Amino acid sequence: MSKEKFTRTKPHVNVGTIGHVDHGKTTLTAALTKCMAAKFGGEFKAYDQIDAAPEERARGITIATAHVEYESAARHYAHVDCPGHADYVKNMITGAAQMDGAILVVSAADGPMPQTREHILLARQVGVPYIVVFLNKADMVDDPELLELVEMEVRELLSKYDFPGDDIPIIKGSALKALEGDGSEIGVPAVEALVQALDDYIPEPERAIDRPFLMPIEDVFSISGRGTVVTGRVERGIIKVGEEIEIVGIRPTAKTTCTGVEMFRKLLDQGQAGDNIGVLLRGTKREDVERGQVLAKPGSITPHTHFEAEIYVLSKEEGGRHTPFFNGYRPQFYFRTTDVTGAVTLPEGVEMVMPGDNVKIEVKLIAPIAMDEGLRFAVREGGRTVGAGVVSKIIE
């Protein structure tokens, strides 16, 4: 079979394996690279190469993550796999590896286990939008009724956490057999069917440039004779000269107009996602704007003080706290470019939170911040990072 030409023109989609320890996430990851390399080109990564994942630091947190890539007929996939449960928790909460969709691996022999549940809950909390299931080790279950029972359990569990359990594709197979090149239904064809399910079920992610304009403000300058310039890196969307924009967060929302965009001291007619720019604001005084606010397309984002979040608390070894914290804890929450103090309410029945834990909390900030669900933040004490979190629900 001739290999199709490897091109970079295919849309790029980020996925990752999640699920209970020893259910076959890393074996499946290796099988995906092998089966797809054979069909569409790309590089096969063996189990040992993936399992020895290098440690990375994201927001001051050490996370071991393996990154692999493979092609399908329609797409280029970037895929993350983590060696340990704690790495998954950290990865999902910090957004170090943003996922457009997740592959939930469940052993058909064991059915859903505690980490299966925990990873589904985390996926819901941090806003992983789509899940596709690979029911692994199907060769270890002789009774087809038992296999159906496990499938039902998985669907129920997904529905419980607000995923569309009845509609989610579930592919049955054996990652190990696929990795060994087995051509039977549960071998290579099962992995090919999984990739087809990713292609069909996970929609192409919206590119940052197509989303509503947003730029976190890093600095504010006054330029005599020209007015006020704010600088920062455009997070999403496009800003054109002459467009009306809002300044959101910390103070009451204010409207202004962009009268100029500059980059590297050159004037442009627009700035777009990824650009480091200065934006000239009409009629805005230097003292009306500050770091920590955002420039945004009018009506696209609102300021909030009260929200629910999922946080990971750094362990002592990671440079975090040495002691637990309790209800009413008041650290700083670092959003984009600035710290805001907030008070923490723990869930009912949770007395305290230990370093190394992850927990759902409620936060009330002393000043409003422009936010939407999925926004990442750091938890800090006097400039030192002690945790990482993600906004899971806005309360007010």
Curated annotation (Swiss-Prot):
Mg(2+) binds at residue 26. Residues 81-84 are annotated as: G3. It is an enzyme of class 3 (hydrolase). Monomer. Residues 10-206 form the tr-type G domain. Gene3D superfamilies: P-loop containing nucleotide triphosphate hydrolases, Translation factors. The keyword Zinc does not apply. Keywords: Cytoplasm, Elongation factor, GTP-binding, Hydrolase, Magnesium, Metal-binding, Nucleotide-binding, Protein biosynthesis. Residues 174-176 are annotated as: G5. It is found in: Cytoplasm. This is Elongation factor Tu. Its EC number is 3.6.5.3. The keyword Cytoplasm applies. Residues 60-64 are annotated as: G2. Pfam families: GTP_EFTU, GTP_EFTU_D2, GTP_EFTU_D3. Residues 19-26 are annotated as: G1. GO terms for molecular function: GTP binding; GTPase activity; guanosine tetraphosphate binding; translation elongation factor activity. PANTHER family: ELONGATION FACTOR TU, MITOCHONDRIAL (PTHR43721:SF22), ELONGATION FACTOR TU-RELATED (PTHR43721). Belongs to the TRAFAC class translation factor GTPase superfamily. Classic translation factor GTPase family. EF-Tu/EF-1A subfamily.
